[in-house]
Amino acid sequence: MQDAITAVINAADVQGKYLDNNSIEKLRSYFQTGELRVRAAASISANAAGIIKEAVAKSLLYSDITRPGGNMYTTRRYAACIRDLDYYLRYATYSMLAGDPSILDERVLNGLKETYNSLGVPIGATIQSIQAMKEVTASLVGPDAGQEMGVYFDYICSGLS
């Protein structure tokens, strides 16, 4: 896992240079939004179950996918979907705090699409649920933090597409 600070420092170090103005500006921006990210993470952590419940209600609960014959029919499959959404929310929050999506590649996306395809998990419905989670989260944390979180939800969706 990498964070915004490590990414900037590593880039300069690889080149054997001091931080340039662009690097300093990236760090300044990261630190200026630090309080916003921490407050958003606290709010998401305190409301994670509600975020997931509302996202499922918006995207999956009344669709064909939850009816007999659907890919989320049976309690076990439904529970696995809820577990995965919780996982995406948690790791998107970690990424938002770090200001870097690398943890999503390392811990979420590597091999996920292939696994879902082999298990018959509908990727379109998964993406729809993540987008619903993005909307619910943005309404909870406000537009600025919601936009920041949206970057990481979109990153997950892009990785699944």
Curated annotation (Swiss-Prot):
Q: How the protein sits in the membrane?
A: Peripheral membrane protein
Localization, UniProt: Plastid, Chloroplast thylakoid membrane
Which keywords does UniProt give here? Antenna complex, Bile pigment, Chloroplast, Chromophore, Electron transport, Membrane, Methylation, Photosynthesis, Phycobilisome, Plastid, Thylakoid, Transport
For this chain, the Swiss-Prot or TrEMBL PTM comment says:
Contains one covalently linked phycocyanobilin chromophore.
Please list the residues that bind (2R,3E)-phycocyanobilin.
C81
- Give all N4-methylasparagine modified positions: N71
Q: Which residues form the signal peptide?
A: none
Under the subunit heading, UniProt states:
Heterodimer of an alpha and a beta chain.
Name recorded for this polypeptide: Allophycocyanin beta chain
- Native source species: Cyanidium caldarium (Red alga)
Gene (name only): apcB
